[in-house]
């Protein structure tokens, strides 16, 4: 036997035995039907940037037909079977409607799916019960979307689930008790939704639960004792709900609890001292409840691990216990609105060497707090709030032992201070200072403007700025000032030019002073930063600058001496929401061109010299308009209010973190409005507030019926004009109306009976018109005084004299209402019909040109029949 065949034989045996080692992997590892399902799922949604500022790339970009889905971003397959087991599309910029039946049916092709993560996209829709069929899921994360509706109870069928994240959606209804079936669950996050009702008692079966987050919902009831028996809990977050009752005294059973958060609820009773004795506790948030009694820390372990203790905004009373000194690791302490009823002994804080944030506002102390002593007591303090207390400021020529300059934020608002604290000069790290609502006189120190980012000096007696001429020559390459509040002082002269150096300004409020001269044109330098500019109630003259500030959200120059026209450059203020030029000398026509500002919500032109007619225009978001006390004239077009859709219905606010008021956390818009016959100052403007004031002009003709489209209107004032004709019955559609004033016009006819059905209408004035007939009998009308109807010789009925002859209601009233509603519908639809009219005229021309004889024959016969029928009916 030759050597060569034997060699090949042994090589064959070798490779046969080790073929598994050298086997080439399959080219297509994933299953074709799963790949197709993923591609179909991808095509259901659009991809739009940006999305939540997520740094991750677009995962579905790698999803292409013909490629191996197991190699796609966000997809994980089982190495042996090729089955897709994980789908992670977090931060994938997916936009669209999640069709539960179709989308979930696609996902049901993945029989062994363990992880489904669709968090932080822009997905809307509801979750159907078929999600319960994904029986192998261990992790489900739908956080950071716009999902709504109820949670399907079938989620309780996902018995292998260990993590369920539904944070930051719009889910509502009650939390299904079936979630108590998830016995392997360790992480449950239902926070920031709209859940109502109580915490299900079935949660007591979640024995493996470590983290429970239910904050920012509308949950109510008591904290179930079953939850306190979940001994593996390390975090409980219940903040910002409507929970009531007392905190359970046996909370010590949660022996490994690290964080307990229940802020912003309605809990009552005392704080159980046992809470502070849990060795592992590091964070306690109980602020803004109705807790009462004295504060007791019990037998605190030494050293305590507690880092944050927030108890402010309750009804706690008595002295601060000396045992607080055992909280040696404390970084943040909030005892604001604590009714101390005595002297604050800051020596009890001497052992809190690491304390960085101390909040003692409105402590109801019987003695004065020495600011110098407090600052000297704490070596690591970064933030200090003593607002609403009596604070002593001692300005000495020298400080023997100046405190360390570590304070970054200091709040001394409303502390009765009469002179500026010199000790603040040593605080080189200070970036936020609030000394508003005091009695400080003199000049504002120049160094503040070069160091601070936030300065609130409003409601004092300042008269100027220290060494302003020197400051104006100072070169500040990177000015830090972002928020400057200087309202309600005694500043005078021109607005100092150093303001122009503060090019990082976001908010500038110099309202209610005595500034004069022109508005500095340099405000245009803030074109990319300035959001809110308030110069109300000064003596500023000249015209509004023509510079463009694209970032501006609110502009208030009311109650000055400005003249000229509104600058047409305002058309480029694309982010403008509020424009208030009330009580100036502006002489211009109505600014129809402002309709291009898509975000404009408040427009106040009151008490100027505006003139001319009002034509139909489009204001999609306008909710408050006041053009009273001007010289507008002419008739209002019948479709005047058709495209004022911001008052037709309120937009659904998808962002629940938005403020209820116009403005931001630092600044809120304000204005003066005629309401119920009186001038009312709105210190804050509710976002749901709507008002229309056209009073004190020279309008004539009929009140447009399209006014009935403004169904969200709260205030309507058309008084002191020359309106004629009947009050439109369409006003009966103004279901939210609280104040109605049509006095001092030339209106005739009867007051529409439909107005009697407006249950919120608390104030009305129909006086000084030519109205006749019986006053409507609604409850709101009966409570009005006779002065609301005076100088209408034809009116009768309560609260006026009884009508001598009571006429049966004519059917014309009902028909007029029906006709009014039909007119409003046709007016609102007219915009969409315009292209159809053009098309119809074109087709008509073709028909008439090609078939005139038969067309006129048919038309003539039909018209003849109608005329004969009409004559016979009349005879």
Swiss-Prot record:
- Specify where it is mainly localized: membrane
Membrane topology, record value: Single-pass type I membrane protein
Note the superkingdom of the native organism.
Eukaryota
Q: Could you tell me which residue ranges are on the Extracellular side of the membrane?
A: 24-822
Which stretches of this protein does UniProt put in the Cytoplasmic compartment? 844-875
Localization recorded for this chain is: Cell membrane
The Gene Ontology CC terms held by the record are:
plasma membrane
- Keyword Transmembrane helix attached: yes
Its signal peptide is 1-23
Asked if the Swiss-Prot or TrEMBL record annotates the protein with the keyword Repeat, the reply is yes
Start-end of the LRR repeats? 110-133, 134-157, 159-182, 183-205, 206-230, 231-254, 256-278, 280-302, 303-327, 329-351, 352-377, 378-401, 404-427, 428-451, 455-477, 479-502, 503-528, 530-549, 550-573, 575-596, 597-619, 620-643, 686-710, 711-734, 735-758, 760-783
Annotated TM spans: 823-843
* A family per Pfam: LRRNT_2
Q: According to the record, which residues are glycosylated?
A: 65, 103, 133, 146, 181, 229, 250, 299, 364, 395, 411, 490, 514, 587, 633, 717, 757, 765
* Alphabetical list of InterPro entries matching this protein: Leu-rich_rpt (IPR001611), Leu-rich_rpt_typical-subtyp (IPR003591), LRR_dom_sf (IPR032675), LRR_N_plant-typ (IPR013210), LRR_R13L4/SHOC2-like (IPR055414)
Keywords noted in UniProt: Cell membrane, Glycoprotein, Leucine-rich repeat, Membrane, Receptor, Repeat, Signal, Transmembrane, Transmembrane helix
Q: Which family does it belong to?
A: Belongs to the RLP family.
Name-wise, this protein is Receptor-like protein 33
Organism in which the protein naturally occurs: Arabidopsis thaliana
What would be the name of the gene that encodes this protein? RLP33
